[in-house]
């Protein structure tokens, strides 16, 4: 109950008109003013933040529990999920046991577009309830050049941590498209390389561990600006990329025809080539950068069966999302097996992995949703032929297609 009488705040003793509002405690002759309430809220928030900044090993899930959680969001990639789960558990054991002398194991994810690299990293952070930030390596530049300073990645993590520095310092950063900043040759360039080797050198500094001086709101540093210090030694860095020509480099080294991601099949040769640090250097990553990414995890290309499972099984699956949207319009949406197979087939042909699934369905779903709600449409069974002509699904309900 809000009061505007001569009653006083039980905390500061002030009354109207010194304060704008008094709130009465139910059933008691006690009051708190709006200003004291705001201070109390800030204090509670700060105490919760300080309590949450301490990472408790008791709350750390096992590697099997982490993989089981990832299984809910990412289809397939079992070996990659196992490797990630073990690496993450080891990383946070290291944080909880600083005297054990454990080295940080940052992670490199290699795999085609749409195989789940970003989703794996994001799901890990969500399960562990640690701050998480994503950066695109192609937008990063060396200090002094137009574009995002590498340290802006730390700013994003700090923002995700609601400016709790201690929480940010145990967070996870995912840098995508790392293969796009490979230098063009193994020889050292004599000219400035704004988007390649120079960015690798700048990233190397924060991955190795440094006390970054970052502007609290992002952007460029200014002489009069108060900076925030963030120690990056305990931040887990996961970097990812497609590395499309890596299989060729590995084949040249081993004389074995690779299978799986980037492979060409020939005869009965089925040995999978594992990428080595020397392959990454040959590709164009500088040796020092490769050395700070000791765990290399290879993701496999997705076949059509995996794409169908991605359509229907995970939390937030595309089919489930569309069924919810149609449900809001009073329509029960189902898909035939043939329709799912055709969507997966077309997505596979696009060579964009799981990302292609939504692109295949988007227009037909949009066209149908535009016509809803309708009193005579309570259910739709979506067939393969409707992908190119979605309004056919409504013709039996008497809808005439517009010209």
Curated annotation (Swiss-Prot):
<dbReference type="InterPro" id="IPR003959">
    <property type="entry name" value="ATPase_AAA_core"/>
</dbReference>
<feature type="binding site">
    <location>
        <position position="33"/>
    </location>
    <ligand>
        <name>Zn(2+)</name>
    </ligand>
</feature>
<comment type="similarity">
    <text>Belongs to the ClpX chaperone family.</text>
</comment>
<dbReference type="InterPro" id="IPR019489">
    <property type="entry name" value="Clp_ATPase_C"/>
</dbReference>
<dbReference type="InterPro" id="IPR027417">
    <property type="entry name" value="P-loop_NTPase"/>
</dbReference>
<dbReference type="InterPro" id="IPR050052">
    <property type="entry name" value="ATP-dep_Clp_protease_ClpX"/>
</dbReference>
<keyword id="KW-0862">Zinc</keyword>
<keyword id="KW-0479">Metal-binding</keyword>
<dbReference type="InterPro" id="IPR046425">
    <property type="entry name" value="ClpX_bact"/>
</dbReference>
<dbReference type="InterPro" id="IPR004487">
    <property type="entry name" value="Clp_protease_ATP-bd_su_ClpX"/>
</dbReference>
<protein>
    <recommendedName>
        <fullName>ATP-dependent Clp protease ATP-binding subunit ClpX</fullName>
    </recommendedName>
</protein>
<feature type="domain" description="ClpX-type ZB">
    <location>
        <begin position="1"/>
        <end position="52"/>
    </location>
</feature>
<feature type="binding site">
    <location>
        <position position="12"/>
    </location>
    <ligand>
        <name>Zn(2+)</name>
    </ligand>
</feature>
<dbReference type="GO" id="GO:0051301">
    <property type="term" value="P:cell division"/>
</dbReference>
<feature type="binding site">
    <location>
        <position position="36"/>
    </location>
    <ligand>
        <name>Zn(2+)</name>
    </ligand>
</feature>
<dbReference type="GO" id="GO:0009376">
    <property type="term" value="C:HslUV protease complex"/>
</dbReference>
<dbReference type="GO" id="GO:0140662">
    <property type="term" value="F:ATP-dependent protein folding chaperone"/>
</dbReference>
<dbReference type="GO" id="GO:0005524">
    <property type="term" value="F:ATP binding"/>
</dbReference>
<feature type="binding site">
    <location>
        <begin position="112"/>
        <end position="119"/>
    </location>
    <ligand>
        <name>ATP</name>
    </ligand>
</feature>
<dbReference type="GO" id="GO:0008270">
    <property type="term" value="F:zinc ion binding"/>
</dbReference>
<dbReference type="GO" id="GO:0051603">
    <property type="term" value="P:proteolysis involved in protein catabolic process"/>
</dbReference>
<dbReference type="Pfam" id="PF07724">
    <property type="entry name" value="AAA_2"/>
</dbReference>
<keyword id="KW-0547">Nucleotide-binding</keyword>
<keyword id="KW-0143">Chaperone</keyword>
<dbReference type="Pfam" id="PF10431">
    <property type="entry name" value="ClpB_D2-small"/>
</dbReference>
<dbReference type="GO" id="GO:0016887">
    <property type="term" value="F:ATP hydrolysis activity"/>
</dbReference>
<dbReference type="InterPro" id="IPR038366">
    <property type="entry name" value="Znf_CppX_C4_sf"/>
</dbReference>
<keyword id="KW-0067">ATP-binding</keyword>
<dbReference type="InterPro" id="IPR010603">
    <property type="entry name" value="Znf_CppX_C4"/>
</dbReference>
<dbReference type="InterPro" id="IPR003593">
    <property type="entry name" value="AAA+_ATPase"/>
</dbReference>
<feature type="binding site">
    <location>
        <position position="9"/>
    </location>
    <ligand>
        <name>Zn(2+)</name>
    </ligand>
</feature>
<dbReference type="GO" id="GO:0046983">
    <property type="term" value="F:protein dimerization activity"/>
</dbReference>
<comment type="function">
    <text>ATP-dependent specificity component of the Clp protease. It directs the protease to specific substrates. Can perform chaperone functions in the absence of ClpP.</text>
</comment>
<dbReference type="Pfam" id="PF06689">
    <property type="entry name" value="zf-C4_ClpX"/>
</dbReference>
<comment type="subunit">
    <text>Component of the ClpX-ClpP complex. Forms a hexameric ring that, in the presence of ATP, binds to fourteen ClpP subunits assembled into a disk-like structure with a central cavity, resembling the structure of eukaryotic proteasomes.</text>
</comment>
<dbReference type="GO" id="GO:0051082">
    <property type="term" value="F:unfolded protein binding"/>
</dbReference>
């Amino acid at each position: 109950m809000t009061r505007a009488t001569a009653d006083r705040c039980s905390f500061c003793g002030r009354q109207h008109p010194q304060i704008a509002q008094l709130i009465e405690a139910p059933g008691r002759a006690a009051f708190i003013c709006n200003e004291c309430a705001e201070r109390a809220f800030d204090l509670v928030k700060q105490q919760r933040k300080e309590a949450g900044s301490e990472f408790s090993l008791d709350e750390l899930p096992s590697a099997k529990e982490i993989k089981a959680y990832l299984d809910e969001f990412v289809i397939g990639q079992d070996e990659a999920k196992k490797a990630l789960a073990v690496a993450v558990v080891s990383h946070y054991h290291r944080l909880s046991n600083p005297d054990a002398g454990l080295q940080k194991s940052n992670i490199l994810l290699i795999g085609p577009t749409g195989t789940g690299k970003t989703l794996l990293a994001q799901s890990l952070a969500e399960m562990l309830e640690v701050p998480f930030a994503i950066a695109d390596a192609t937008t990063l530049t060396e200090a002094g050049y137009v574009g995002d300073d590498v340290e802006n990645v730390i700013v994003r993590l700090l923002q995700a941590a609601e400016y709790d520095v201690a929480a940010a310092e145990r967070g996870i950063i995912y840098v995508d498209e790392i293969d796009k900043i490979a230098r063009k040759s193994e020889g050292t360039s004599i000219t400035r390389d704004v988007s390649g080797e120079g960015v690798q050198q700048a990233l190397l500094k924060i991955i190795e561990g440094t006390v970054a001086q970052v502007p609290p709101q992002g952007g460029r540093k200014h002489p009069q600006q108060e900076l925030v210090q963030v120690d990056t030694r305990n931040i887990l860095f996961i970097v990812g990329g497609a590395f499309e020509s890596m299989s060729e480099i590995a084949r040249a080294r081993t004389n074995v025809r690779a299978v799986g991601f980037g492979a060409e099949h020939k005869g009965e040769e089925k040995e999978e080539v594992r990428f080595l640090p020397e392959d990454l250097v040959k590709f164009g990553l500088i040796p020092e950068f490769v050395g700070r990414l000791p765990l290399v995890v290879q993701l496999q290309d997705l076949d059509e069966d995996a794409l169908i499972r991605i359509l229907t099984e995970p939390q937030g699956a595309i089919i489930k999302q569309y069924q919810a949207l149609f449900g809001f319009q009073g329509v029960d949406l189902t898909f035939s097996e043939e329709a799912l197979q055709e969507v997966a087939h077309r997505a596979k042909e696009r060579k964009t992995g799981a990302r292609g699934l939504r692109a295949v369905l988007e227009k037909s779903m949009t066209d149908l949703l535009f016509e809803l709600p309708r009193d005579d449409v309570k259910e739709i069974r979506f067939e393969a032929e409707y992908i190119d002509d979605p309004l056919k699904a409504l013709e039996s309900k008497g809808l005439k297609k517009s010209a």
